[in-house]
Every structure is written in C-alpha cells, then in structure tokens.
Amino acid sequence: MAVDRREAALPVAAPPPTTTEHAAGAAIRQSSLWQDAWRRYMQNKAALAAAVIFVIICLYCLLVPGFWKIPGIWTSLKDYDPNAVDFSQSYAGFSLDHPFSTDKFGRDLFARVAVGGQISIAIGFAATFMILVIGVVYGSLSGFIGGKVDNGMMRFLDALYGLPYLPFAIITTQILSPSGSVSVWTMVVSLTIASWFTAARVVRGQVITLKENDYVRAAKAVGARWYRVLARHLLPNTLGILVIAIFLELPGVVLGEAFLSFIGLGINPPTASWGSIAQDGREAYRLHPEVLFIPCLAIATLVLCANFIADGLRDALDPRTRETG
C-alpha cells in the first residue's frame, strides 16, 4: 500500500509526558532559574562586594571570641576578655594590644564588638525567621481564602501599620519584661511582634497573583485540598520573595535592637550588643569618639550590606530582568 508523501512528511506526535517527566522538567526549570539568578547576582559588583563584607563581619564575630580561650594567640587572655575590667587601661587608645581601644572600664573593644555582634546578628536572624514564619502563614491564608476573610485580615494589618514602629517595640518589650530584665529572646519576640506586617502583606500579594495561574486552577479542579495547593504550588513559588525578604527585614531588626539598647531598654548587662556598646561610649564621645564610632560603624556597615544584598537578590530573581537580559 502506497503512502502519501505529504502524510509521511508530517511529524509523528510524541507520546504524552509522564508524571515523572513533568517533575523532571519542573526540577530542571527551577534549577535553571536559580542558576540564572546566581549568575546575575555575581555580575552585580556592588551586591557581591556587600556579600563579601557581610560574611567578613559574621566571621569576625564568630571567630574572634574563640581566640581568647587559646593560650598564646593574644598577648594576654585577660586583655581580650570582653568583660574583664582594668581601670588602668581605661580609654587606652588604639594599639596592637587593643586594636579598637578600650572603654571606660578598660574592657577591650575588639573583643566586645565581636561578642556584641554575635548578639545583634543572632537577634536579627532569629527575629527575621519568626517574622517570615508569621508573615507566610498569615499572608498566604489571607490571599488564598480571599473575600471577606481577606478583607478583615487586611484591615487588621492596616490598624497595626498605624502604630509607630519604635514606640510599639518599646511598649511590647516592657509588657514582656515587667521586671525590667530584658533577655535575648524577649528582644527577639518584641521585634518580631513589631515587624511582621510587611512580610505578611508581601506574601499575600504574591499568593493572590499565583493562585490565578492555570496549574493552580487545575489542582483545584482535580480535587486537591487547599493546604496541598498551598504547600505544593503556591508557597514554593514565593521562595524568591522570601529570600529577598530576609535581607530586607534584617536591617530594620538590627537597627531596632540597637536603638532600644542605646536608650537603655535593651538587653541587660553584662550581655553586650552593638547598641549597648554604643550606649556605653556616648558618655565620653567628645574626648574618645572611637568608643562610640566603632559600634555605630559596625551597625551601619551591616545594615548597608544587607540592603545592597537585598537589592542584588531582587534584581537577580526578578523575572522581568531575566527576560530583558
């Protein structure tokens, strides 16, 4: 039997892809998206430099405290104990023994800034994590449910937005610590309560946009439960936004903790944070400006680096940037 040449020239239809092939294709697309984002981030010189400086600050805060415990590393272990008091070394100035000078009690600032950085950065990341958890839960439920529920949840957020950030954080801190003893976790919870609104609103907007996509409607059409749609189709696609949100929320939390500690409402001594070190240095900043300048410089550098990193991540993960690149 003769075969029509035109019929023979038509492409043969490929068999429909299996579920495994669908999953493999999705994994490849997701991998290429993150690879493309990484390439774009590495091309952003400002964001790359900010990331390097950010890592250096974190390593300094993590590694320097361990050196006090190793004999022979420093000239004197006592000199580099952040809580060791030696009035004969009060405001000793810059030297090899005290690279960042000393405070009024003769405590080495090189060690104290490192330990204070541990506390400030730990509070920043812990509060940011809690902010994102609350924001994801609240925002995703509000955006997915929609209707009157969404409207009511957003009006509640609007009411909270009307509260000034720092006074709200101060009041929350005082409520959680009526005795006046403020711990690290008290500070984390206080800053979380005062800061989670923006994350919730961002996640809500992303979920509202994503839930109109065909793959979400298809999942609903086949009877997928709401929590499965959220967990499998919506929340994974907000990952890029959440990564950016980490470095957008971190500066505000670090500044909030520094402000509360600077005005005497932060973590109780002898626990040091960058804000409390700056508070100690304000008494003699006219004669010894380095005691106030160094912790403030550490705060400003970390905040600027986090902002540059967030900008770089936003540019790298923005689909419109990828399309025009």
Model-derived features with residue positions:
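Gly/Trp-centered helix-boundary motif
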Residues: 1-136, 140-141, 148, 223, ...
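Hydrophobic alpha-helical transmembrane segments in multi-pass membrane proteins
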Residues: 47-53, 119-135, 161-173, 236-257, ...
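Generic hydrophobic transmembrane alpha-helix motif, especially the helices
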Residues: 99, 103, 109, 130-137, ...
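Short hydrophobic alpha-helical segments within the ABC transporter permease transmembrane module
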Residues: 112-114, 156, 203, 207, ...
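Glycine-rich helix-loop "coupling/hinge" segments at transmembrane-helix boundaries
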Residues: 161, 172-176, 191, 207, ...
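Alpha-helical transmembrane segments
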Residues: 192, 196, 200, 249, ...
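Transmembrane helix boundary and interhelical loop/hinge segments in multi-pass membrane proteins
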Residues: 205-215, 313-320
